[in-house]
Amino acid sequence: MSSIITLLTYYWLIIFSIIGYGLLFNKIFLRSESQNLGFIGIYGIFSLLLISYISSFFLPHTQIFNLVILSLGLINFFINKVIFDKELKKLIFIFGFLIIFIFISKNHDDFSYYHFPYTHLLTEYSGIIGLGNFTHGFKTSSSIFYLSSPVSYTHLTLPTTPYV
């Protein structure tokens, strides 16, 4: 039971961190005061993807890196939380409902073939280029791998649920 509570807490922290990065992206690059939480979430995912793509050449996405990335997004979220308190209630309701589907879903059939190994390599090593020569599954890297590596919870002792 405690592992499910830990997992749920981590999911909420990831969501709030993504929104924090979206707010930062919106403020710096778009110079907009938009309060549309959907667009801010997309901006946050884009920001995390950009950070992940660039940092994977220089740093492995270790526990410390993930903690720093998560913390920076959370700090920015809590600094700017007042901007959209009404939208925040909608987010909590919608994500609270959708989290049910996360728990009843199953892994894709090729998760153990290349989804998990590629994400695991991103968390262990930096500058991994040419992995397509080793196995067919690594020839085309997906942005999902790079999005899941900075928010992976490999440092937590949880049951084997690969959802991030």
Q: Predicted segments — roles?
A:
Residues 1-84:
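Membrane-embedded, hydrophobic transmembrane alpha-helices
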Residues 76, 87-110:
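Transmembrane signal-anchor helices characteristic of membrane glycosylation enzymes that use polyprenol
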Residues 7-14, 60-66, 110-113, 135-142, ...:
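Membrane-interface micro-motifs in multi-pass membrane enzymes
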Residues 105-118, 124-147:
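Extracytoplasmic catalytic/substrate-binding loops of multi-pass membrane glycan-assembly enzymes
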Residues 1-3, 142-153:
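Juxtamembrane membrane-water interface segments that cap and precede transmembrane helices
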